[in-house]
Every structure is written in C-alpha cells, then in structure tokens.
C-alpha cells in the first residue's frame, strides 16, 4: 500500500498506477491488525459500502432493464396484456423512457443502495475474517487449496449478509418491476412496498425466494471473490504495482463469469418474488424451475443476462474502487494478500 506521504506526492494517477489489486480487506480477526488500527473494521465497512453505493447508482438504468426483462413473464400487468411485452434491451430502454419517464430508470435504486451498502460492506469485511479461520495457502505452491479457501470465504460471507438485507432486495425487485405510471403504479416507494406486501401476505412474504437466493449467492459470491483473489495471486507477481486497467479487466471477467454462472438462480428467485402477496404462479422453488424449463425453455433462465453482463461493469468497478477508497481512508493498511 502507499504511504500517506507518497499518496500526497503521487496524486490520483500515481495512486492508480501503484495501487494494490482489488478489494483487499485486512484480516480483521488478526490481533496484529486490530491492535494497530481499532477502526479497521469501520473503515472496511465505509470503503466497501461507499464504493457499492456509487456504482449501483451509476448502473441503475441497466439494472432496471435487466429486472424488467427477467420478470416480465411473472408480471401481472404484462401477462394480462395491459402493458405490451418488452422485446429486448433496446426496446425496453426506449419504452421505459417514453412511457414512464427517464427518472423511472432509478425505481428501486434507493432500496438497492440501502441494501447494497451493508451487503457489500459486510461481504468485503467478513470475507477475510472467515478466510482467517482456514489455513493460509500460497497461490504459487498450493493453487487449489488457495482457490477453495477463497471460494468458501466469499460464498459464506455473501450468504450471511443476504439473511439481513433480503427484504430490501425483495423491495428493490418489486419496485423496479412496477411498470405502471402515475396512479397506476403498484407501489409509490420503498416504505409503501414493504408495508403493502406485509399487509397482504405477512412478514414472511418478504422472504419469497430466499432459499434459492442462498444457493445463488453462494455460487455468485464464491466465484466473485474466489476467482478474483485466485486470479490476482496467479496473474500478478507484485499486486502493489499492478496496473489499474489490468485490475479492471480481471475484475470485469470475474463479475461477468460469476453473473452468468449464477443467473438461473437469480431468475427463479425473482419469479418467486413477483408472486408474493398476489396470485401464486409457482408452488415453490422446484416447481418454478420445472415450469420455466417446460413452458418457456432453458433460455428463459437467461432472460436479461446480457444486461447483467453490462451491469457487471459496475461490479468490476466496485472491486477496484473499494481498494482505492480504503487506501484513502487508511493509507497504512496492509493488503491481506501480501501477508
């Protein structure tokens, strides 16, 4: 990591050239780290949450288009013919802008930012805490053991944080999938969405699709963190001198790959979310998998996947931006990969 003096001398361009790879969080459970900086945990949360909030707001229009394409076969207004189907990414962008207004691209973004701050922050913060419970292996001499440790720590961190923020993720999906305009909107905002769904189906209605979400989050986060940390250890001899754009390219490939791999799980959970508090289209997770495959074909599990790849640019940006923010907050922190 750069020292405070070097940071002041180098400026932003020097920081980007000399930055360490990606989201390197400290081993918060390590006595050495916590004694050196008792605020390391708080700084971890602040850096990860800030980076996530910025990137999510930037890619919110792509996120909403992805959700509309992904859930339209479970959207009552579209299924009834009240609102015509979207035929693709471009068609969705054009119609949403003309029918609902440009500002509607950010429907559900508040819930997403509120959700994403603790989700991403806890993912990054607890990943290395969990990883600290496992033996440490070198990516050069014990590649597969190193890979498995990173895969497990990333997956467990994501699954744990999901339990806390799932109602916000649920609300984000329902708000983004609301194709009404003006008085025809189903929900007017985050609080209205949560209160109406609870009134219709009880508190557990906010956890529709949670089971398959846990499966998907383990697959996604496991690949997201595990592959990224593994790629860093294998591709970069000195992480501290890694090129900014090289970091971004690796992060982009990881987020795209992890997103496609876990996308069918995401489609199923979104479909289950859409029926909460209303008419039931599926009797459960297995029934949803079966009906989508039989009635719409396997490609239906990947509706909106291309939008998800584009949105992945924001995820890759988070991985790189996180480290830059963390170094600004805590210039003397030591990268976990360098220990």
Swiss-Prot record:
Amino-acid positions noted as binding ADP in the UniProt annotation, renumbered to this chain: 115, 127, 269
GO MF annotations, alphabetized: ATP:ADP antiporter activity
Gene3D superfamilies according to UniProt: Mitochondrial carrier domain (1.50.40.10)
Pfam families: Mito_carr
UniProt entry keywords in alphabetical sequence: Antiport, Membrane, Mitochondrion, Mitochondrion inner membrane, Repeat, Transmembrane, Transmembrane helix, Transport
Name of the protein: ADP,ATP carrier protein
Gene Ontology terms describing biological process: mitochondrial ADP transmembrane transport; mitochondrial ATP transmembrane transport
Main location: mitochondrion
Modulation of this protein's activity: The matrix-open state (m-state) is inhibited by the membrane-permeable bongkrekic acid (BKA). The cytoplasmic-open state (c-state) is inhibited by the membrane-impermeable toxic inhibitor carboxyatractyloside (CATR).
Membrane-spanning residues: 41-70, 110-134, 144-164, 212-232, 245-265, 305-322
PANTHER family with a match to the protein in the record: ADP,ATP CARRIER PROTEIN 1-RELATED-RELATED, ADP_ATP TRANSLOCASE
UniProt cross-references to InterPro entries, sorted A to Z: ADT_euk_type, Mit_carrier, Mitochondrial_sb/sol_carrier, Mt_carrier_dom_sf
Location(s), subcellular: Mitochondrion inner membrane
Quaternary data: Monomer.
Catalytic activity: ADP(in) + ATP(out) = ADP(out) + ATP(in)
Organism: Parachlorella kessleri (Green alga)
Function (record text): ADP:ATP antiporter that mediates import of ADP into the mitochondrial matrix for ATP synthesis, and export of ATP out to fuel the cell. Cycles between the cytoplasmic-open state (c-state) and the matrix-open state (m-state): operates by the alternating access mechanism with a single substrate-binding site intermittently exposed to either the cytosolic (c-state) or matrix (m-state) side of the inner mitochondrial membrane.
A single cellular component GO annotation: mitochondrial inner membrane
Region entry Important for transport activity, spans: 269-274
Membrane-protein topology: Multi-pass membrane protein
